[in-house]
Every structure is written in structure tokens, then in C-alpha cells.
């Protein structure tokens, strides 16, 4: 049930009295549909402008239904996506970008609270597909294949679904009940999930299970190692294993990793920030990060570092570990050259820590490919695929962390959808053709009569002094704020019923 249309933020101007702050029209407009920049920037391929318009009208369930046509995990993505759509938003040229992620989260949470159900899938095709891995890419692919009428089974090596959503993102950013309930909806739609089942031989699993196609979506769960000279090393862990142990300890009541009183994390990415903040919540007195570049050159998002510092975590910039002697960590002070690369200075310092967590990146375990002749692997350790995400083996597709791309949740989700649509076409003996795209619309093409100031809504944030557990830090929008925020959308490239 939709609500009444919101009042326009900008009143209808009387052009006989004033011309406003935008350009003056001297000719009648011509209808020319264009591509909104938010849609263009979304790695999951969401039609953001469409569901924002429905949300503005108060048609929340219809907005959610439109959203899950492209992305089955809106409550998850509204929390963990780094929202490149907002960086592209034309509204940012006037005041603030539309808080798209907050509205997506609102719709996802409303669906969970109200028990909304997806539309029925297409008629059964009679085809069976095996998905290897229950991370964001595998879950997305399974969902879209199910929507298209195919029978899908996911086989997951771990004890729980979610992949890096569960074992790489702490619960203070993504509550586990939110993840569990969105996964449960995918399974309730008809997808089968088999846990604790590591696929060792893909072709054998395909043939014995009678599957017509396979999508490999194995995440990057192997930590990259670095050789650090150590006379007598203290406890050294990798960040991926540490975060996984901490997650299982929180969810299943298992003992948390033992770190001692002081812990150092080596690395400058988002995983390093998550590891440090998780360690603080596990009770360490001091958590520090050691990183060889400066703040401007770190791979972590700026807000991640700021939140870590708010929680009392010290970041040692321009420091590189040279050797370890029990609890003493010798670091060399670095400087950046003209290209921003760290170079040694010959100056050394000693830091103290009872444990060292290495957060230097992750790799995919590609041992599953050893039994598959013909699959090409690049020197970077990723699978070579065609534009339709199929490998050189007919019917064998791959996506997410396994293929060349940036490794984010939303990109992995987009890969799952893309693979599903190409797999559907392949299973039916056809080729998938992406819908025609319109030209991208920029701010100079909007022809705004008035540039009304309407600042973005703010989500409630738990103060730093209260962040002593794994409770969620950032809250959601209420109905009024969600509709207001959706109304801030310029509806770029489309009619917004003025």
C-alpha cells in the first residue's frame, strides 16, 4: 500500500517574476531518456532511480521487490557496500549525495520485519546447476538462477553460509541475524544449501549430481604471507583466520582467540582495521596498526581508519616491520618518494606486542582446479574467463574473488547476477544480450530551475565510548527520514512527475 506523494521540496516557480538559480528555458523540452549516474556506478546493476521513486511515494514493498530483482541481499548491502553510487550522485554537486545505502538498508530491514515475500519464480526449466561457495557471489547467482526457473544447489565448505560476509566482516558492521534471515529467504525460495561440503573434484561432482552447469564462487580466504626475520617470535596469526575464529566464538560460544594484553596488526586495508577493532572488543588493552605508507595512501576507506582511531587504536604510519624478537617488534621508519612508494630511511624503532596479526591481503585456494583440464589461471592467481564469465570448459563459470576484478561484496554480487543470466541463456541454447543502455546524464544536463538546499539525513551512530561489544554501531532511518531522503533524488534521466 503506497502513501500519498510527498510535497515537492521546491515550489513551482513563477517564471514571469523570477528565473530561479538554474538556466532559463527558451525552447520546449524534448523527452530524452538517459542513464542515471547511480545506476551506472552500481556494481550489482541495481535500478536505483526506480526503487528510490517508489520509496519516495511510500510504496516500500514495491520498491523492495524492484530492488531484489537485481540484488537479493538489500539489508546486507545497505550496511556493508561502500556505495560508489553515492560518489556518482549528481545531487552532490548541489549539497549532499542521496544516502542511497541508508534507504536500501531501510527497505531490506522493512522486508525482514514485515515478512515480505518475493514474487514466484519462472516456470521450472528442468535444468540443474551447482554453485560452489555460499559467499555473496554464490548466493547471488543461486538466487537469480532460481528466479529464472532452474534447480540450484549450493555446496559450501564451511559450517555456515555467507563467506566473507560472515567471516570477514565483524558483527558490529553486519549483525548476524540480518545475514541469516536474508540467506534464509534465498533458501525458502527453493535453493538447496549443503554445508561442510568441500568440493574437491568439480567435474566429478557435476557428473555424479546430474548438474547441467557449474558456477565456481570460492572466496579469497587464504592469507598472503610475508617472511619476517624472527629470533623468537611471539604469537603470529593471519587476519582472515583471526576474524573467522572471532566470528565463530561470538556466534557459537567458542573460546575467542588468545591475544595477550597488547596486539599489533600489520597492514593498512579494511581487514586490518576490522582486525584491530575486533581485538579491542575481545578485551586487549592495547591494539595498534603498523602500516608502511601514510593515511593518504592506505587501501582502507578513510572512515574505517577514523572509526578505529575513535575507539583508541593507534595507527603507526610509515613503519615497516624488520624483525621480531619475542614481544619486541623492530620497525623501520619509511618515507614516501615522488610516486608515493615507501622507501627506507635507516631509522629504527621498537614496538611491543604480545601478538602480531598479519593483514597483508588474501588469495583464493585454486586447488579445486587441479582436476579440471583446460582452465587457465593467470600469474596473479585468478581464473581467466570470457565476457560471459565462462571458463574455457563449456558450462563451467566462475566469478567473485576467483576472477580478475576488485574484491568487494557488491562486485561479487554483480558477478553472481551476470553469471546467472549468461548461464540461463547457455542452458537454453541462446546468448544473453544486455539491454540497451542510454547515455549517461551529468549535472549540466539536469536543467534545474532551483538548486534547493536539502541536506542528507544522518543515521544514528553509537558513541565511541559505548562500542565495547559486537552490537551494531550505525542505526537505520525511520519511515519519515527514508521518504525524505528518497525525495532528494533528482530522478536523473527519467520523468519524476513534476
Predicted regions and their residues:
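Mid-to-C-terminal Rossmann-like scaffold of FAD/NAD(P)H-dependent oxidoreductases
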Residues: 8-10, 14-30, 307, 320-323, ...
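Glycine/serine-rich phosphate-binding loop and adjoining beta1-alpha1 elements at the start
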Residues: 14, 40, 44-120, 187, ...
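Feature captures the FAD/FMN-dependent oxidoreductase FAD-binding
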Residues: 62, 123-132, 180-228, 322-330, ...
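Glycine-rich dinucleotide-binding loop and its adjacent helix/turn
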Residues: 107-123, 181-196, 201, 223-282, ...
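N-terminal Rossmann-like FAD-binding beta1-loop-alpha1 element of flavoenzymes
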Residues: 127-153, 271-280
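Rossmann-like dinucleotide-binding cores of NAD(P)H-dependent redox enzymes
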Residues: 151-154, 158-193, 276-321, 431-446
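FAD-site-proximal beta/loop scaffold in flavoenzymes
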Residues: 234-260, 339-406, 447
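A conserved FAD-binding loop/helix module that cradles the flavin
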Residues: 275, 399-433
Amino acid at each position: 500500500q503506497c502513501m500519498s506523494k510527498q510535497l515537492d521540496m521546491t515550489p513551482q516557480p513563477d517564471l514571469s517574476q523570477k528565473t530561479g538559480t538554474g538556466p532559463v528555458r527558451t525552447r520546449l523540452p524534448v523527452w530524452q531518456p538517459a542513464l542515471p549516474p547511480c545506476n551506472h556506478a552500481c556494481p550489482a546493476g541495481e535500478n536505483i532511480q526506480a526503487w528510490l521513486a517508489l520509496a519516495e511515494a511510500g510504496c516500500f514493498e514495491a520498491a523492495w521487490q524492484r530492488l531484489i530483482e537485481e540484488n537479493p541481499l538489500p539489508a546486507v548491502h545497505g550496511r556493508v557496500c561502500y556505495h560508489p553510487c553515492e560518489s556518482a550522485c549528481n545531487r552532490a554537486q548541489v549539497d549532499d549525495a542521496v544516502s542511497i545505502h541508508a534507504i536500501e538498508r531501510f527497505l531490506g530491514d522493512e522486508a525482514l520485519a514485515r515478512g515480505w515475500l518475493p514474487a514466484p519464480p519462472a516456470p521450472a526449466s528442468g535444468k540443474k546447476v551447482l554453485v560452489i561457495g555460499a559467499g555473496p557471489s554464490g548466493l547471488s547467482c543461486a538466487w537469480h538462477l532460481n528466479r529464472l526457473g532452474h534447480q540450484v544447489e549450493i555446496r559450501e565448505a564451511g559450517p555456515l553460509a555467507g563467506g566473507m560476509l560472515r567471516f570477514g566482516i565483524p558483527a558490529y558492521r553486519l549483525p548476524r541475524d540480518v545475514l541469516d534471515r536474508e540467506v534464509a529467504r534465498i533458501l525458502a525460495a527453493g535453493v538447496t544449501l549443503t554445508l561442510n561440503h568441500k568440493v574437491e573434484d568439480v567435474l566429478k561432482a557435476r557428473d555424479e549430481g546430474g548438474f547441467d552447469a557449474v558456477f565456481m564462487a570460492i572466496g579469497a580466504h587464504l592469507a598472503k604471507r610475508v617472511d619476517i626475520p624472527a629470533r623468537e617470535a611471539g604469537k603470529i596469526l593471519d587476519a582472515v583466520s583471526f576474524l573467522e575464529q572471532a566470528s565463530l566464538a561470538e556466534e557459537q560460544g567458542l573460546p575467542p582467540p588468545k591475544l595477550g594484553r597488547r596486539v599489533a596488526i600489520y597492514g593498512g586495508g579494511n581487514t586490518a582495521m576490522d582486525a584491530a577493532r575486533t581485538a579491542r572488543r575481545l578485551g586487549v588493552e592495547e591494539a595498534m596498526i603498523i602500516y608502511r605508507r601514510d593515511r593518504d595512501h592506505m587501501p582502507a576507506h578513510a572512515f574505517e581508519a577514523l572509526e578505529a582511531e575513535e575507539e583508541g587504536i593507534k595507527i603507526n604510519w610509515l613503519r615497516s616491520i624488520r624483525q621480531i624478537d619475542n614481544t619486541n617488534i623492530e620497525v623501520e621508519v619509511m618515507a614516501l618518494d615522488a610516486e608515493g612508494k615507501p622507501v627506507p630511511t635507516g631509522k629504527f624503532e621498537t614496538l611491543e606486542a604480545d601478538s602480531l596479526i598479519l593483514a597483508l591481503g588474501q588469495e583464493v585456494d585454486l586447488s579445486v582446479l587441479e582436476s579440471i583440464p583446460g582452465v587457465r589461471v593467470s600469474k596473479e592467481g585468478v581464473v581467466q574467463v570470457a565476457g560471459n564469465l565462462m571458463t574455457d570448459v563449456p558450462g563451467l563459470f566462475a566469478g567473485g574473488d576467483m576472477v580478475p576484478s576488485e574484491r568487494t561484496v557488491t562486485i561479487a554480487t554483480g558477478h553472481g547476477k551476470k553469471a546467472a543470466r549468461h548461464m540461463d541463456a547457455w542452458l537454453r541454447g541462446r546468448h544473453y544480450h544486455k539491454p540497451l543502455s542510454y547515455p549517461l546524464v551529468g549535472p549540466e544536463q539536469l536543467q534545474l530551475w532551483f538548486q534547493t538546499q536539502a541536506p542528507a539525513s544522518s543515521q544514528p551512530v553509537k558513541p565511541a565510548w559505548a562500542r565495547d561489544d559486537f552490537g551494531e554501531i550505525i542505526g537505520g532511518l525511520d519511515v519519515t527520514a527514508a521518504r525524505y531522503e528518497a525525495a532528494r533524488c533528482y530522478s536523473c534521466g527519467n520523468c519524476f512527475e513534476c
